[in-house]
């Protein structure tokens, strides 16, 4: 498999508080990597650093043999290849569903209005949101908003998609519709890094699971290894809390 991303010795501090400590891992084309761990373990900060929404304090992020953590790299160009779906959707409330999925294509990728529209319609249909293209975000449910956010990210035709707890802000009955879209993307070979508390998704859909604790990668491996035969006591304790919840 061809390598897309390589994270080398990545650290991130906010003031004196070190949130990420010497993180190393690689992402290959077609990987679905679930990042699990307790709140405050650094999972979301890791994704934000990978997407350059946060500037790493130290370390390197190699994307297709280029260190994008280098200050000379333009973040918006890199982000068109590595998309992100946020917990809180981050849709533009004053724009329709369709326009939300067009604006990035036109501004960043310089696509024509018609090309952006056709591409947006394709991905909105893919996530089941074609009937709502003229709605504003306030007129649709949380699950529908997240499906629009996924379509918006896909419309940029990224090589990698980052998901930051995409279901944690949703009512329980809406979680399934978002996870099903993500499962379909995995089946189609989309490369994904997913910060999640959805353990069934991590176990059933991922090909690799990364367990983080206190800013470090404590354990990683196949879902069968991490869930079925964890090596570290911290991992065992974390998974036991979920099983007993």
Language model regions located:
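ABC family nucleotide-binding domain
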Residues: 3-223
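C-terminal boundary and immediately downstream tail of ABC-type ATPase nucleotide-binding domains
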Residues: 213, 220, 224-245
């Amino acid at each position: 498999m061809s390598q897309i991303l390589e994270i080398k010795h990545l650290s991130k501090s906010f003031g004196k508080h070190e949130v990420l400590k010497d993180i190393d891992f690689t992402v290959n084309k077609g990987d679905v990597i679930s990042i699990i761990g307790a709140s405050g373990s650094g999972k979301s900060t890791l994704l934000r650093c990978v997407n350059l929404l946060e500037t790493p304090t130290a370390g390197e992020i190699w994307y297709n043999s280029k260190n994008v953590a280098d200050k000379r790299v333009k973040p918006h160009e890199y982000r068109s290849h590595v998309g992100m779906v946020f917990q809180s959707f981050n849709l533009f409330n004053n724009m329709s569903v369709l326009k939300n999925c067009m604006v990035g294509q036109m501004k960043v990728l310089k696509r024509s209005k018609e090309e952006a529209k056709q591409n947006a319609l394709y991905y909105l249909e893919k996530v089941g949101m074609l009937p709502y293209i003229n709605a504003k975000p306030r007129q649709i449910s949380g699950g529908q908003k997240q499906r629009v956010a996924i379509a918006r990210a896909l419309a940029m035709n990224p090589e990698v998609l980052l998901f930051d707890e995409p279901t944690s802000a949703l009512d329980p009955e809406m979680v399934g519709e978002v996870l099903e879209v993500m499962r379909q993307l995995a089946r189609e070979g989309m490369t994904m890094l997913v910060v999640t508390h959805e353990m069934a998704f991590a176990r059933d859909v991922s090909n690799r699971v990364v367990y983080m604790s206190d800013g470090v990668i404590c354990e990683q491996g196949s879902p069968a290894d991490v869930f079925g035969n964890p090596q570290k006591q911290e991992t065992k304790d974390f998974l036991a809390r979920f099983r007993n919840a």
